[in-house]
Amino acid sequence: MVTPEDLECLKRIALMGGLNTPVFLKTISLGSELGFSPQTASRRLRSLEQQGFISRTLGTDGQQVTITHGGEDALRQEYCDYYRLFGRQEKSLMLNGTVQSGLGEGAYYMSLQPYADQFQRILGFTPFPGTLNIRLLPGATLQRKRLSSAEWKVVQGFESEGRTFGDVRCLPCFIRDVPCGIIIPGRTHYPEELIEVVSPEGLRKRFSLKDGDEVTIEVTL
């Protein structure tokens, strides 16, 4: 598990631009910014590298450091934790609906690694192999139209074994304090009263849900 000291160091590298491109740094300057000695800063970098959170290229007068996908995931998880603490103070949209059975296709698509990897980066979790299908109550369908103004993320499609898999739009949400994501396959015309949700665990089992049970989806706009 990443330590608070390692996470602070990782965040500093990200703020320097290490999420997108390699950044040049010296342990003495990094330590000064973090309140560490150069020796401690060097240990933090070695620890981050050993955990797979950064990659480094050492030089004679410093080093090039890049944050890996694993490091980005660690930062996203930290963001999700703070979002759960403070983000709910923002304007939220509550959508009420009832659980219903789907076609069982969600388990297959969530098991595809290119999709799963992107959901991990966007939502901060690897999706459970399956989705929760929800039919909105009559009063919630008007509320759903407001989702068009939300900041949807796009999970890129891909090709595999001669088959093309399309883009998927994704919107972070919560169901009973569990971070989830509303998904809309790009090639599918969903009825407005239907919502499909991915989550880090099986919500039916977690909350003992059965068809017809009412649930609330919370989306921060």
From Swiss-Prot:
* Entry binding sites for Mg(2+): 131, 133
**Pathway(s) the chain acts in:** Cofactor biosynthesis; FMN biosynthesis; FMN from riboflavin (CTP route): step 1/1
Q: Where does FMN bind?
A: 188, 196
- One Pfam family hit: MarR
Q: Name one GO biological process term.
A: riboflavin biosynthetic process
Drop me one GO molecular function for this one. magnesium ion binding
Arranged from A to Z, the UniProt key words for this protein are: Flavoprotein, FMN, Kinase, Magnesium, Metal-binding, Nucleotide-binding, Transferase
Catalysed reaction(s) here are: riboflavin + CTP = CDP + FMN + H(+)
Entry's EC annotation: 2.7.1.161
Region H-T-H motif-like, annotated ranges: 1-92
* KW Repressor (keyword) present: no
Q: Would you identify the family this protein belongs to, as annotated?
A: Belongs to the archaeal riboflavin kinase family.
Q: What does this protein do?
A: Catalyzes the CTP-dependent phosphorylation of riboflavin (vitamin B2) to form flavin mononucleotide (FMN).
Q: Specify the protein name.
A: Riboflavin kinase
Instruction: Give me the gene this protein comes from.
Output: ribK
